Amino acid sequence: MFKISRKNYSDLYGITTGDSVRLGDTNLWVKVEKDLTTYGEESVFGGGKTLREGMGMNSTMKLDDKLGNAEVMDLVITNALILDYTGIYKADIGIKNGKIASIGKSGNPHLTDGVDMVVGISTEVSAGEGKIYTAGGLDTHVHWLEPEIVPVALDGGITTVIAGGTGMNDGTKATTVSPGKFWVKSALQAADGLPINAGFLAKGQGMEDPIFEQIVAGACGLKIHEDWGATGNAIDLALTVAEKTDVAVAIHTDTLNEAGFVEHTIAAMKGRTIHAYHTEGAGGGHAPDILESVKYAHILPASTNPTIPYTVNTIAEHLDMLMVCHHLNPKVPEDVAFADSRIRSQTIAAEDLLHDMGAISIMSSDTLAMGRIGEVVTRSWQMAHKMKAQFGALKGDSEFNDNNRVKRYVAKYTINPAIAHGIDSYVGSIEVGKLADIVAWEPKFFGAKPYYVVKMGVIARCVAGDPNASIPTCEPVIMRDQFGTYGRSLTSTSVSFVSKIGLENGIKEEYKLEKELLPVKNCRSINKKSMKWNSATPNLEVDPQTFDAAVDYNDLENWLEQPAAELAKKLKKTANGKYVLDAEPLTEAPLAQRYFLF
């Protein structure tokens, strides 16, 4: 038997079972749990390599031929290290007709046993050795303000947005709402020319009939926002329509507590599922205790990224940002007080810990309205780094193995937002049958800058050099548009998400859309238990005087490797026996200046 050192093997084929790799310049490591390729039969493209005619490439099978369950792929990514909520493992990825068709071993079944997908005459190959592959990310809090957010999103690893808006109107600068048929149609028509998956939220304030007609127009969900009025009646009616049409409802609650307090908002929901935006509250919501919504099973809590992670600069940047985003006047004392009420260091500090406990399930941006669309992925991993640095390993993790923490955090911007908006059967993970929206990363750039972004099997954005060079690696090497962003390729490699009733009513033909429209589904049958790796419901209370966020002792158990008793000694204990969730602000972040000086 031929033997090879792990170092030599990883140099040739990428790391394998039992090996670990560091994620960017963070303190996080992932350990390969399994390898679905076959030692000695690895698929490798290139001169003198295995994927040649008569060897690893089959020369006789046509595109629609099958041998057992194995069929010829359009694209095979070889020896990929998959980082997904489903696991951290190595495999070949087969893509066909824009979808993930196989995960396992590629090759020529006429020569090799155990082949799951065929490399044939019709197959292109992408060399995945030494790279990490994640599902395209989702951002479910996008203000539809300008089209240039799309390449920024793609360059940050985001391939799907749930958005709302009308362009640079003041309503959209504050709220993610495409109100009424005209604006839903306009948004879908604009998305037809952009290389990203998109769905749009309509206004969730009003009586049932005008809300319903927006869903018929194709809105994939509803948004309740305090700037339009987040009253108990609005919440009840929006959820009533959503229950009838199977769409999601997102909410930005009442900061000023004008129509009631957090308990009144919770009561108006009547146990019906709702996606709570920026649950900490700096982005908006009942001051100071909207964070308490993490304890309810019917609320799917999310964060927006300006408060993530908590750093020494977080508080300082928020006041002016908030004044601009919500059309406030710094000369009006009441407006200044409104802004001040939303920025609380205590709840911002607690937010990171609640993410690490799995109590906040989703990450998003709030792009151009107190958030950055290109930093959803980056800030998620900065927060994971911060939590490991300050609190140690997550339960079940060990040296060079942060797999549990990594799965928790990757789920926050992939599968969980997809579940929340009824699109998890299409996107959100690397699983057979889903759209082939995949992001490749060099490990040293993981979480900061992708190597390429694939949309439904076609590269949309990629690191590429001077177009006039003799080889593709000559400087300047930057992210550039690829063929997936042009012509009919653009409309055939992205989709738009709409309501089922809108699709059935023929909006594709009426609006003259070229992209495939896919209906959202199962939006009303989910709850927090549906959130992968992030379903904790701690009994959190926010002190209205000190703004301290505290949980019970049992909420600290089964979180970290360090015993709950040891952690409890480090946390402040309240008069009623709870433990305050607090952490120091980060003074130096990974995935930051080292990657973005130029």
Curated annotation (Swiss-Prot):
Its cofactor is Ni cation. Coiled coil: none annotated. It is an enzyme of class 3 (hydrolase). One of its GO terms (biological process) is urea catabolic process. This is Urease subunit alpha. CDD domains: Urease_alpha. Its EC number is 3.5.1.5. HAMAP family: Urease_alpha (MF_01953). GO terms for molecular function: nickel cation binding; urease activity. Substrate binds at H225. Belongs to the metallo-dependent hydrolases superfamily. Urease alpha subunit family. Ni(2+) 2 binds at K223, H252, H278. Residues 136-598 form the Urease domain. InterPro entries: Amidohydro-rel (IPR006680), Metal-dep_hydrolase_composite (IPR011059), Metal_Hydrolase (IPR032466), Urease_alpha_N_dom (IPR011612), Urease_alpha_subunit (IPR050112), Urease_AS (IPR017950), Urease_asu (IPR005848), Urease_asu_c (IPR017951). Ni(2+) 1 binds at H141, H143, K223, D366. Pfam families: Amidohydro_1 (PF01979), Urease_alpha (PF00449). It catalyses: urea + 2 H2O + H(+) = hydrogencarbonate + 2 NH4(+). GO terms for cellular component: cytoplasm. Carboxylation allows a single lysine to coordinate two nickel ions. It comes from Ureaplasma urealyticum (Ureaplasma urealyticum biotype 2). The modification N6-carboxylysine is found at K223. Heterotrimer of UreA (gamma), UreB (beta) and UreC (alpha) subunits. Three heterotrimers associate to form the active enzyme.
